[in-house]
Curated annotation (Swiss-Prot):
Organism per entry: Danio rerio
Membrane-topology descriptor: Single-pass type II membrane protein
Cellular component terms per the entry's GO annotation: mitochondrial inner membrane; mitochondrion
Name by which UniProt lists this protein: Ubiquinol-cytochrome-c reductase complex assembly factor 6
Chief subcellular location: mitochondrion
Transmembrane segments: 10-32
Gene: uqcc6
Topological domains annotated Mitochondrial matrix: 1-9
Tissue occurrence: Highly expressed in skeletal and cardiac muscle (at protein level).
């Protein structure tokens, strides 16, 4: 008995934690929408854009006001 609980309860809790982890990863994946394309030629240093465009737009809007 791991952690002082019965095996069926332990397995249920383990399954619930794994499923919630997968669901959370899916939500984050859909929210950020990563670019999964692989370029033919790797970008040169300083060429790769990694900033969040929505955040950048909000910051520019707040600076204009």
């Amino acid at each position: 008995m791991p952690a002082g609980v019965s095996w069926p309860r332990y397995l249920r809790m383990f399954a619930a934690s794994v499923l919630s982890m997968f669901a959370g990863a899916q939500v984050v994946h859909h929210y950020y929408r990563p670019d999964l394309s692989i370029p033919e030629i790797p970008p040169k240093p300083g060429e790769l854009r990694t900033e969040l465009l929505g955040l950048k737009e909000r910051q520019m809007d707040s600076q204009k006001q």
